[in-house]
Amino acid sequence: MHYKLLFAAAAASLASAVSAAGVVGAAEGFAHGVTGGGSASPVYPTTTDELVSYLGDNEPRVIILDRTFDFTGTEGTETTTGCAPWGTASQCQVAINLHSWCDNYQASAPKVSVTDKAGILPITVNSNKSIVGQGTKGVIKGKGLRVVSGAKNVIIQNIAVTDINPKYVWGGDAITVDDSDLVWIDHVTTARIGRQHIVLGTSADNRVTISYSLIDGRSDYSATCNGHHYWGVYLDGSNDMVTLKGNYFYNLSGRMPKVQGNTLLHAVNNLFHNFDGHAFEIGTGGYVLAEGNVFQDVNIVVETPISGQLFSSPDANTNQQCASVFGRSCQLNAFGNSGSMSGSDTSIISKFAGKTIAAAHPPGNIAQWTMKNAGQGK
């Protein structure tokens, strides 16, 4: 009953975000303490140029989005020759030859003409920013966001990022974090994205929380040519601690998430639903503790072989070892019409010592609650 009350409180607090001019709640897990723009007076951009200016200046900002900012075509178009490594069927993504990717890695793939648009380079977000959507009105279309080059203390809450060259791999990412610290992505919806929905780059990205967000993999185009987006969440930083809590990952086929570099990931109380392919991909330097998650209709929960380390909260007895650091046992994961998740590397638990750890709840009501409450406007 206690966890039901906690989730009810979270839902109520975000419902108030529909009318609130500012951030609601506080980050759980590793990004705890992030303040974004703090108490700065809210600003309301009305044009794409004004939005870019507010996001990129050096002032602490609380930026309220109350409309759709459509960047599609705002930087012109460029027709180039790309490639079709997954085939030329109508549902297959084709690839832009970015940084000679087609030439270097897919030289034998059929050549195709593709159109390069504004989505290739995301909007720069500088330090001390809160980007907050009003109800379901705050949408950034055709271009993503990037928190990079030392930017820190950023909150992205209750917005949607959509329609970034969905036909084209390398067409753009929804949210990029690289060489940063204290970033909270909360109640965000991403949909119809060309490449990664969320990517943490190879520099140190430090403390990041992604919570109560919807990664919607439905698309007319995919690398697997079946309407299930492949490029979900890629965590590749050199010194990263990432909390994934309460998110809804829907209709994907891979990289959900891909974890490597030197990344400590706490994946807790997420719903993985309707995957035609794999969810977790754990490479060298990926340290994953997964608890209280629900996997429903996920063909492959963890791609093998695992090159990193995984503690999958495998059974009640083993899960008691979490108490030495977490002050509680870890929660079992739940599986419905899905593959298995096997990983009992308890050495990962000690890596959480002294860190801010998100609470975990039993998986019983996670699916129902997450479908109702994760994403923009919920």
From Swiss-Prot:
Keyword Lyase recorded: yes
Gene Ontology CC entries for this record: extracellular region
Residues the record marks as active site: R255
Keyword field contains Chloroplast: no
Keywords, alphabetical: Carbohydrate metabolism, Cell wall biogenesis/degradation, Disulfide bond, Glycoprotein, Lyase, Polysaccharide degradation, Secreted, Signal
Molecular-function GO term, any one: pectin lyase activity
Family: Belongs to the polysaccharide lyase 1 family.
Stated name of the protein: Pectin lyase B
Provenance organism: Aspergillus niger
